[in-house]
């Protein structure tokens, strides 16, 4: 029989030299396989005297256990090294520049609405909202709009039936707010409105902000002062403003507000006036005790003037080349 110490020494050296799991398995077969060195040693026990056979068998089994232990340890070592190499190959290189995530921006119409809300909020005006599908009372009757007014025709208003329609202004919010409370009132009502019109300066849906203040001893001079300050704040410069007499069914007296452009021409930007007594009566407010003023402005129109946009329809076409300019 080959000396066991020599077999173990050779096995130990070959196990340590095995550089892969495949090579290690070849070593295992060489020593523990059917024709392996230690297997042959066991098969040779029959040639020994009975007195030597038992001791030799114990030594051979001990040698097998030693080799199996060495094989197991080397296998664990190789598997760990293989895993570490794989992880190293998959490691993210943090020194590489990352992909830039492009931030979005507020739509220019949203920017304008927020700017308006901020200005009037600092003056104590709350922000109110209401339904976009409105009934005839809140959209027309309570606002002193006569039955034969052009706004009541299909050419200007989207009707569902004679009493339900898409609101043509946010004035209905003013009526609902006054119905649900008691004077004094001080609020603005921004929102989407709908009119049957579409061209370079009109779209079927657009945004309005209407405002109202109702209290005792409210006068036109207060209205003029607030709107002048608002326009100067909005355009971020001192602007020349004029109030031109006009007519609105829900205000008396009424005026349209113009600003003077740099080329000397006047441009209309909003409408306003003192709340008509009939409007106050429609919501149960005594016009002998209370008075008020109201104003309304088209958000897209103000946005066009502020940013120099010529076509209102550009705000709704979702052209990123256009919208990215307002980030």
UniProtKB/Swiss-Prot annotation:
Its subcellular locations are: Cytoplasm
Keyword Protein biosynthesis tagged: yes
At the top level, the lineage of the source is: Bacteria
**What would be an example GO MF term here?**
magnesium ion binding
Catalytic activity annotation: tRNA(Phe) + L-phenylalanine + ATP = L-phenylalanyl-tRNA(Phe) + AMP + diphosphate + H(+)
The protein's required cofactor(s) are namely: Mg(2+)
Q: What is its EC number?
A: 6.1.1.20
| Co-factor binding details | Binds 2 magnesium ions per tetramer.
* BP GO terms, sorted: phenylalanyl-tRNA aminoacylation
**Residue numbers binding Mg(2+):** 252
**Any single Gene Ontology cellular-component annotation:** cytoplasm
Write the record's keywords in alphabetical order, separated by commas.
Aminoacyl-tRNA synthetase, ATP-binding, Cytoplasm, Ligase, Magnesium, Metal-binding, Nucleotide-binding, Protein biosynthesis
InterPro entries linked: aa-tRNA-synth_II, aa-tRNA-synth_II/BPL/LPL, Phe-tRNA-synth_IIc_asu, Phe-tRNA_ligase_II_N, Phe_tRNA_ligase_alpha1_bac, Phenylalanyl-tRNA_Synthase, tRNA-bd_arm
Matching PANTHER family: PHENYLALANINE--TRNA LIGASE, MITOCHONDRIAL, PHENYLALANYL-TRNA SYNTHETASE
Under the subunit heading, UniProt states:
Tetramer of two alpha and two beta subunits.
UniProt similarity note: Belongs to the class-II aminoacyl-tRNA synthetase family. Phe-tRNA synthetase alpha subunit type 1 subfamily.
Tell me the HAMAP family matching this sequence. Phe_tRNA_synth_alpha1 (MF_00281)
Q: Under what name is this protein listed?
A: Phenylalanine--tRNA ligase alpha subunit
Its source organism is Aliivibrio salmonicida (strain LFI1238)
